[in-house]
Amino acid sequence: GEIDWFFNPTEHTSHDNEWTWSLYRHIYWQPLARAYALTKDEKYTKEFLHEMTEWGRAWPVTPFMENEEDAAAKYKFPGHSWRTIETAMRIYTVWLPCMEAFRTSPVWDREGWVTFLTLLCDHADFLMTHYSNHKKSSNWLTMESGTLLECGILFPEIKSDWFMTGYRRVMQEVKYSFDNDGIHMERTPIYHMVAAGVYFQCYRLCKLNDIPVPPYMEPTLEKSAQFIMSLVKPDLSTPMIGDADRDDLTTRRCDTSLYEGMNLTFDPYDLNEMRAYFRTWYEETGREDFRFMATAGKQGTPPAQRNYKYIPAGIYVMRTGWGPEDSYFHVHGIQLERGEVSSHSHNDTGHVEIHAKGEDILTDSGRYIYNSSCWKDWRHYFLSAKAHNTLYVDDHEMGTVPGVTRTRGVRTYLHAFEENEQYQLIDISHNGYDFMDDPMFHRRRVVRLPDDVYVIEDRVTGICREDHDIRLYYNFAFGHLDGENGKFDYTSQKGRGYTMTVQADKKLDFEILEGSEDPIGGWISYGYAWRKPIPQLIAKHSGKAPIHFITVLAPAGIRAEAAINGDAATVTLADGKVLTLTENAVELH
């Protein structure tokens, strides 16, 4: 039957506009183009032309060009086709690749070309007069400007200002949107890759057409690829920092979202967009570490560097190596550039993720759903400290500044980032709870010791006048967790056993949730609109700060006994050595 271009199956469940917006991104035309390239069967061309024509009839641009606000008001649900993000995204990820795949088809006749080019002009002209310019999340303007530049380069016969407008915007934004470490201002892997992919596509198109680019463009974009590479875990997946999914270099497709997926670019050789991204960078630079990523470790050489500290972004990564049985942990205190909206950042400062011997142990819970749906309580949960491995206080949104909306003022101070023969250490503090009525301060140290023993120390201080709901949350990867009274046993997906002990210098209560809907707790989302139960441990204290926590995670049978004595926290190991953490020192002797 014919496609209903106004259909949304979530009307009576999540009531989520993202489903319809995904429909308007036309990503399902990519398989038609691939099938035609392989078979030259004209039924695929006919279907592409038919769907394009019918979509154009269903969604003319004129009402949105004349008065976007009034036109959009008619489609609060299920959403409309002419948001600038969809307008831009479908052109560079689908329409232009489909043009390349189908353009020699004898079925694509003059009428089809008139329809295609008319609609393409509608898109580019609409983007000329509708520029989000950081009023929305910055990935919107990335796609808008990239699409204008690509249309300007590929269609010089069409008299327009597309090229110069897109060119100016892209060359300015590629530096404005990425810091000197090559990290995108939204600080989350999939939106980073969206922006990096658009600008890399623009860079390559400029090079192929002898169009000058600024001297900072190529090194900035190469660093953006290095950043994603530095986050990759030993199992070749990426961490779910902020609104990110679990993307995997080893699978047929890297993205598991049911809809609202990554939508990076179109690659003719590989459905896994992340592998394709690194392969293209390998072709561009000849770097063997990019080849290592592009082939999921089968060829090339792993990166020479193991540990990475990104102070401006607030992301810190340590690992034992790049092999499948290596271990990895990261701590983050995401710092958004001043003025950047917080759309895709979570309330998770101090979050620690632990990946031991090639599998996740402590994990980020992912993103699951956006506020475009009616499931606001689920969105709030996945944004909150509860869905991360960090300190929770009174459900306060970290970094909230009174009178300022959609901006996170969290800043992290890095006290130490150190590796020696005895341990690896990441030590941070932050201002996330400063604007509470009774301000509180949080310092976290994460120490990795031999035998994959991890020590997490949390010091919570402040004026300490009021009682608070103070909690530590630990979200475990798929597996089994049980225990009580501060000692818990966890069995991982690979059947490995671990023991976690949690202590404090004040009374603690404990709770384990797994797949709970009331209260919401113990869930993970590897992709948008997808969730599964996981074990979640909560250590709770009701009362005043200060409070001093010490958490130890160790493989089963490995001795690691913790204690708190005054200012010092100690962990006694099997060989008799003692790790001592005081306010100003970390020592193992």
Q: What does each of the following model-derived ranges do?
A:
Residues G1, N8-T10, H130, R319-G321, ...:
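Structured loops at beta-to-helix junctions and adjacent beta-edge loops in soluble globular domains
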Residues E2-P9, H15-V232, S237:
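Aromatic-lined, polymer-binding surfaces characteristic
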Residues E18, L23-R25, A313-I315, T349-H351, ...:
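Extracellular structured ligand-interaction cores
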Residues A88, A244, P268, R275, ...:
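CBM-like, beta-strand-rich accessory domains located in the C-terminal region of large
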Residues L148, I228, M318, D458, ...:
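A residue-level signal for conserved active-site and pocket-lining positions in enzyme catalytic cores
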Residues I183-L362, F417-E421, G543, H548, ...:
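Carbohydrate-active enzyme catalytic cores, enriched for enzymes
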Residues P324, E337, Y368-Y370, D434, ...:
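Short, surface-exposed beta-strand-loop junctions and turns on beta-sheet-rich folds
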Residues L362-S365, I369-S373:
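Cytochrome P450 core scaffold surrounding the K-helix E-X-X-R motif
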